[in-house]
Amino acid sequence: RGEDSPYGDAWSFLTNEEGITNFWRDGLIRNRSFENVITMGMRGENDTAILGADATMEDNVNLLRRVLKTQNQLIRETINENLDEVPRMMVLFTEVEAFFYGDEKTKGLLDEPELEGVTLMLSDNNQGAARTLPTKAMRNHKGGYGMYYHMDMHGGPMAFEWIGSTYLPKLWEQMTAAYEFGVQEIWVTNIGDIGTQ
Protein backbone atom coordinates (compact mmCIF):
# COMPACT_ATOMS: atom_id res chain seq x y z
CA ARG A 1 0.00 0.00 0.00
CA GLY A 2 1.27 3.44 -0.83
CA GLU A 3 1.50 5.91 -3.68
CA ASP A 4 3.77 3.62 -5.72
CA SER A 5 1.78 0.46 -4.98
CA PRO A 6 -0.33 -1.17 -7.72
CA TYR A 7 -3.08 -1.16 -5.10
CA GLY A 8 -3.05 2.58 -4.46
CA ASP A 9 -2.96 4.41 -1.18
CA ALA A 10 -6.57 4.21 0.03
CA TRP A 11 -8.86 1.37 1.11
CA SER A 12 -11.75 2.99 -0.75
CA PHE A 13 -13.61 1.61 -3.75
CA LEU A 14 -15.00 5.10 -4.33
CA THR A 15 -11.65 6.88 -4.67
CA ASN A 16 -9.34 3.95 -5.50
CA GLU A 17 -11.43 1.57 -7.60
CA GLU A 18 -8.54 0.53 -9.85
CA GLY A 19 -6.19 -0.22 -6.95
CA ILE A 20 -8.79 -2.18 -4.98
CA THR A 21 -9.78 -4.12 -8.11
CA ASN A 22 -6.11 -4.99 -8.74
CA PHE A 23 -5.79 -6.13 -5.11
CA TRP A 24 -8.81 -8.43 -5.44
CA ARG A 25 -7.69 -9.78 -8.84
CA ASP A 26 -4.21 -10.61 -7.55
CA GLY A 27 -5.69 -12.34 -4.48
CA LEU A 28 -7.97 -14.47 -6.64
CA ILE A 29 -5.10 -15.46 -8.93
CA ARG A 30 -2.75 -16.20 -6.01
CA ASN A 31 -5.28 -18.48 -4.29
CA ARG A 32 -7.14 -20.07 -7.21
CA SER A 33 -5.37 -23.42 -6.91
CA PHE A 34 -6.65 -23.84 -3.35
CA GLU A 35 -10.09 -24.80 -2.05
CA ASN A 36 -11.75 -21.48 -1.20
CA VAL A 37 -14.94 -19.84 -0.11
CA ILE A 38 -14.58 -16.34 -1.53
CA THR A 39 -15.70 -13.47 0.68
CA MET A 40 -17.87 -10.95 -1.16
CA GLY A 41 -18.66 -7.34 -0.35
CA MET A 42 -16.53 -4.74 1.36
CA ARG A 43 -16.36 -2.79 4.58
CA GLY A 44 -14.38 0.33 5.32
CA GLU A 45 -10.96 0.42 6.87
CA ASN A 46 -10.74 -0.84 10.47
CA ASP A 47 -14.21 -2.45 10.44
CA THR A 48 -16.10 0.73 9.58
CA ALA A 49 -18.89 1.47 7.11
CA ILE A 50 -17.75 1.39 3.50
CA LEU A 51 -18.43 5.12 3.00
CA GLY A 52 -18.26 6.43 6.54
CA ALA A 53 -20.86 7.88 8.87
CA ASP A 54 -21.89 10.82 6.68
CA ALA A 55 -23.03 8.75 3.68
CA THR A 56 -26.66 7.83 3.11
CA MET A 57 -28.11 4.34 3.04
CA GLU A 58 -28.64 4.73 -0.71
CA ASP A 59 -25.01 5.76 -1.28
CA ASN A 60 -23.73 2.72 0.64
CA VAL A 61 -26.10 0.25 -1.04
CA ASN A 62 -25.30 1.57 -4.52
CA LEU A 63 -21.55 1.35 -3.89
CA LEU A 64 -21.91 -2.20 -2.55
CA ARG A 65 -23.81 -3.14 -5.73
CA ARG A 66 -20.84 -1.89 -7.78
CA VAL A 67 -18.44 -3.79 -5.51
CA LEU A 68 -20.40 -7.05 -5.91
CA LYS A 69 -20.65 -6.66 -9.68
CA THR A 70 -16.90 -6.04 -9.94
CA GLN A 71 -16.09 -9.00 -7.67
CA ASN A 72 -18.32 -11.39 -9.62
CA GLN A 73 -16.75 -10.24 -12.89
CA LEU A 74 -13.25 -10.82 -11.48
CA ILE A 75 -14.27 -14.32 -10.34
CA ARG A 76 -15.60 -15.09 -13.83
CA GLU A 77 -12.32 -13.87 -15.38
CA THR A 78 -9.91 -15.60 -12.99
CA ILE A 79 -11.65 -18.63 -11.44
CA ASN A 80 -14.68 -19.90 -13.36
CA GLU A 81 -17.16 -18.32 -15.77
CA ASN A 82 -19.92 -20.29 -14.04
CA LEU A 83 -20.40 -18.55 -10.68
CA ASP A 84 -22.64 -21.41 -9.51
CA GLU A 85 -19.49 -23.55 -9.26
CA VAL A 86 -17.60 -21.03 -7.09
CA PRO A 87 -18.35 -21.05 -3.33
CA ARG A 88 -18.92 -17.44 -2.23
CA MET A 89 -20.20 -15.84 0.96
CA MET A 90 -21.07 -12.40 2.25
CA VAL A 91 -21.06 -11.64 5.97
CA LEU A 92 -24.02 -9.45 7.00
CA PHE A 93 -22.39 -7.98 10.09
CA THR A 94 -23.30 -4.64 11.74
CA GLU A 95 -23.83 -1.94 9.09
CA VAL A 96 -23.73 -4.44 6.20
CA GLU A 97 -26.86 -6.07 7.64
CA ALA A 98 -28.64 -2.71 7.42
CA PHE A 99 -27.49 -2.29 3.80
CA PHE A 100 -28.79 -5.79 3.02
CA TYR A 101 -32.30 -5.03 4.28
CA GLY A 102 -32.43 -1.35 3.31
CA ASP A 103 -34.94 1.04 4.85
CA GLU A 104 -38.24 2.73 4.05
CA LYS A 105 -36.54 4.93 1.41
CA THR A 106 -33.87 2.62 0.00
CA LYS A 107 -34.20 -0.89 -1.38
CA GLY A 108 -31.42 -2.96 0.14
CA LEU A 109 -29.47 -5.87 -1.30
CA LEU A 110 -32.06 -8.51 -0.27
CA ASP A 111 -32.98 -9.42 -3.87
CA GLU A 112 -29.72 -8.29 -5.47
CA PRO A 113 -28.96 -10.44 -8.57
CA GLU A 114 -25.21 -10.23 -7.84
CA LEU A 115 -25.85 -12.16 -4.59
CA GLU A 116 -27.53 -15.09 -6.34
CA GLY A 117 -25.73 -18.24 -5.26
CA VAL A 118 -23.82 -16.42 -2.50
CA THR A 119 -24.13 -17.87 1.02
CA LEU A 120 -25.41 -15.07 3.26
CA MET A 121 -23.62 -15.20 6.60
CA LEU A 122 -25.80 -13.92 9.43
CA SER A 123 -24.24 -12.98 12.76
CA ASP A 124 -24.87 -12.62 16.45
CA ASN A 125 -25.15 -9.33 18.33
CA ASN A 126 -21.74 -9.77 20.03
CA GLN A 127 -23.51 -11.05 23.15
CA GLY A 128 -24.57 -14.45 21.89
CA ALA A 129 -28.00 -13.75 20.38
CA ALA A 130 -28.62 -14.11 16.65
CA ARG A 131 -29.24 -10.67 15.13
CA THR A 132 -31.64 -12.05 12.54
CA LEU A 133 -32.75 -15.31 10.95
CA PRO A 134 -34.16 -15.82 7.46
CA THR A 135 -37.90 -15.50 7.07
CA LYS A 136 -39.80 -18.29 5.35
CA ALA A 137 -39.79 -16.28 2.11
CA MET A 138 -36.02 -15.74 2.32
CA ARG A 139 -35.15 -19.42 2.86
CA ASN A 140 -35.28 -20.14 -0.87
CA HIS A 141 -32.14 -18.04 -1.45
CA LYS A 142 -30.00 -20.09 -3.83
CA GLY A 143 -26.75 -19.72 -1.86
CA GLY A 144 -28.33 -20.57 1.47
CA TYR A 145 -27.38 -19.09 4.83
CA GLY A 146 -24.52 -19.36 7.26
CA MET A 147 -23.68 -18.02 10.72
CA TYR A 148 -20.75 -15.97 11.99
CA TYR A 149 -20.86 -16.30 15.79
CA HIS A 150 -18.68 -14.51 18.35
CA MET A 151 -17.35 -16.41 21.31
CA ASP A 152 -14.69 -13.72 21.62
CA MET A 153 -15.19 -10.05 20.80
CA HIS A 154 -12.72 -7.22 20.55
CA GLY A 155 -14.30 -3.94 19.62
CA GLY A 156 -16.38 -1.04 20.79
CA PRO A 157 -18.20 -0.40 22.91
CA MET A 158 -17.05 -3.46 24.86
CA ALA A 159 -14.66 -6.34 24.54
CA PHE A 160 -14.64 -9.79 26.06
CA GLU A 161 -11.40 -11.54 25.28
CA TRP A 162 -9.81 -14.64 26.76
CA ILE A 163 -12.79 -15.35 29.00
CA GLY A 164 -15.60 -17.83 28.43
CA SER A 165 -18.51 -15.40 28.53
CA THR A 166 -20.80 -17.32 26.17
CA TYR A 167 -23.17 -19.41 28.27
CA LEU A 168 -23.12 -22.82 26.56
CA PRO A 169 -26.89 -23.49 26.85
CA LYS A 170 -27.46 -20.12 25.13
CA LEU A 171 -25.02 -21.07 22.38
CA TRP A 172 -26.85 -24.38 21.89
CA GLU A 173 -30.24 -22.63 21.85
CA GLN A 174 -29.16 -19.98 19.33
CA MET A 175 -27.42 -22.40 16.97
CA THR A 176 -30.32 -24.87 17.15
CA ALA A 177 -32.74 -22.08 16.22
CA ALA A 178 -30.44 -20.98 13.40
CA TYR A 179 -30.25 -24.53 12.05
CA GLU A 180 -34.04 -24.92 12.22
CA PHE A 181 -34.43 -21.65 10.28
CA GLY A 182 -32.26 -23.01 7.47
CA VAL A 183 -28.90 -21.53 8.47
CA GLN A 184 -26.96 -24.64 7.48
CA GLU A 185 -24.39 -23.87 4.77
CA ILE A 186 -21.41 -22.47 6.69
CA TRP A 187 -20.83 -21.84 10.39
CA VAL A 188 -17.86 -19.75 11.52
CA THR A 189 -17.01 -19.18 15.18
CA ASN A 190 -14.84 -16.25 16.20
CA ILE A 191 -12.85 -17.64 19.12
CA GLY A 192 -10.23 -14.89 19.20
CA ASP A 193 -6.57 -15.50 19.76
CA ILE A 194 -4.79 -17.83 22.12
CA GLY A 195 -4.37 -16.38 25.60
CA THR A 196 -1.26 -17.24 27.56
CA GLN A 197 -1.07 -17.94 31.26
Q: PLM features: residue spans?
A:
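Contiguous N-terminal and early-domain "leader" segments and peripheral loops that mark the onset or edge
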Residues: 1-2, 126
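Active-site-adjacent "subsite" loops/lids of carbohydrate-active enzymes
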Residues: 2-25, 142-148, 168
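Glycine- and acidic
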Residues: 5-9, 47-58, 152-164
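General structural signal for secondary-structure boundaries
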Residues: 12, 102-103, 107, 166-169, ...
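Gly/Pro-rich turn-and-neighbor structural signature
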Residues: 14-142
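Structured mid-domain segments that build the active-site/substrate or prosthetic-cofactor binding neighborhood
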Residues: 122-128, 135, 139-197
